[in-house]
Amino acid sequence: MAIVLLLIGTALLFSLQTAGADDAVSVDEAADLAQDLTNPLADLMTIPIQMNYDQDIGAGNKGERLRTNIQPVIPFHLAEDWNLISRTIVPVIDQDDIFPGEGSQFGLGDTSLSLFLSPKKPTASGLLWGAGPIFLLPTATDSLLGGKKWGVGPAAVVLTMRGPWTLGALANHVWSVAGDSDRPDISSTFIQPFAAYTWPNAWTLSVQSESDYNWETEKWSIPVNAALAKLVYFGKLPVSLQAGVGYWLESPATGPEGWRFRFQVNFVLPNLFSGK
């Protein structure tokens, strides 16, 4: 299934790169927008839909999981010099043979909501930053798809954009504060360093890690991902198409192993909450 998904994503990435292109959009404008999409704090309203396929999961290393993250990003203009960036992740999970004797599960996972208060302009040294809370919401539709815990903690991101490069890191920590007392407590640190290079033709190559440390079990989960994205226009609608591959450097005994695959479609929408 992973190969099929990757082939479909790659075919779309290359065959649709000029589909519906708006002649009024200059090459420079497209490249600038493509690079802006590498900035988690960009003043852009977007809806990324990201598919991640992982394998060799569970006690017998026979399980597989397709996780589709719906990730709306909404910037709110609080004042002349400040934005509040809302980043939500709603996972739709399809998994099989991960838990012995439980078969397959399909449904929603737990939702996370991050709010970043961020100055609109970079610092004198060229840094962009944002900080705020992250909330974990127990929205899972199956007990095997979520932790049945409410969580909260701090979140922050810092980055710089120099020429075609975007370099930075995003981090958060979540503690469980309420929920099912029979389920394990949550104390988890997430660290995401990232680097991206955007070419003048609106192609972007990115490398990142999405590392997670579970303080309750004292275990790391460390995948490293590389992806290639292309910004295209369907009429006047900008859409970024991305295909990528990753590898698990470290994971718990029952966690995913080996290669992972990713495909993402990111829709760039007019900002309805800009206050303009």
Predicted features and spans:
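Boundary at the C-terminal end of the N-terminal hydrophobic targeting segment
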Residues: 15, 19-21
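Transmembrane beta-barrel domains of Gram-negative outer membranes and organellar outer membranes
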Residues: 21-276
